[in-house]
């Protein structure tokens, strides 16, 4: 399997510049993207209402702002609450159903540590600004959640590469109506006349 997109968390202030430098100078710079998860709660401005600026790339609850601050590397910003809910919803889909995410094998113990990371946070339904969102919080005394963050990043990276659930996929472009042979011949005749010669069909 070829890796087409790899996000690297650049949110931790002490390592932000190191992440940007690595992404800029790596031999894999074409697939590396510094990423910043943003907590978008019920009272926050949702990603769908951000004002788009020239050069921005906007996707499903993520965006890549135009390059700024003298940085040669563009970065990704995504709604962590939305994407954490997205991942947990995928895990809750019954095995074999469309849109599900499952783990390999039959031995639950093989995935215990991974499951601990995925359950180190819990969601709280919160209302504000006329909408209801899940806000994710770390469990009191909860353990590490790094692999949960990593899985969320994988889902966002897949979205960047065009992977989408059917309900989130962009509508296909309409097909042009079929052309009659006589119309094609007429168009070719006109093009030849404009180039300075008419030879008939």
What are these regions (language model features)?
Residues 1-130, 161, 173-201:
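Mg2+-dependent endonuclease catalytic cores in nucleic-acid-processing enzymes, primarily RNase H-like
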Residues 115-166:
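Extracellular low-complexity, Gly/Ser/Thr-rich intrinsically disordered linkers
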Residues 165-173:
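Mixed-charge, glycine-rich, non-catalytic linkers/tails in nucleic-acid processing enzymes
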């Amino acid at each position: 399997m070829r890796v087409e997109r790899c996000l690297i968390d650049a949110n931790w202030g002490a390592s932000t510049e190191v992440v940007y430098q690595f992404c800029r100078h790596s031999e894999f710079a074409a697939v590396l993207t510094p990423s910043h998860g943003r907590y978008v709660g019920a009272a926050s401005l949702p990603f769908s209402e951000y004002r788009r600026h020239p050069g921005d790339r906007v996707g499903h609850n993520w965006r890549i702002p135009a390059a700024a601050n003298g940085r040669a590397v563009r970065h990704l910003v995504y709604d962590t609450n939305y994407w954490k809910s997205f991942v947990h919803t995928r895990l809750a889909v019954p095995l074999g159903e469309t849109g599900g995410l499952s783990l390999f094998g039959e031995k639950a113990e093989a995935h215990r540590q991974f499951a601990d990371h995925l359950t180190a946070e819990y969601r709280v339904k919160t209302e504000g600004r006329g909408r209801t969102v899940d806000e994710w919080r770390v469990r009191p005394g909860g353990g590490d959640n790094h692999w949960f963050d990593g899985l969320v990043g994988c889902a966002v990276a897949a979205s960047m590469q065009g992977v989408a659930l059917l309900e989130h996929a962009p509508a296909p472009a309409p097909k042009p109506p079929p052309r009659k042979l006589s119309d094609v011949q007429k168009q070719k005749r006109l093009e030849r006349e404009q180039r300075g010669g008419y030879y008939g069909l």
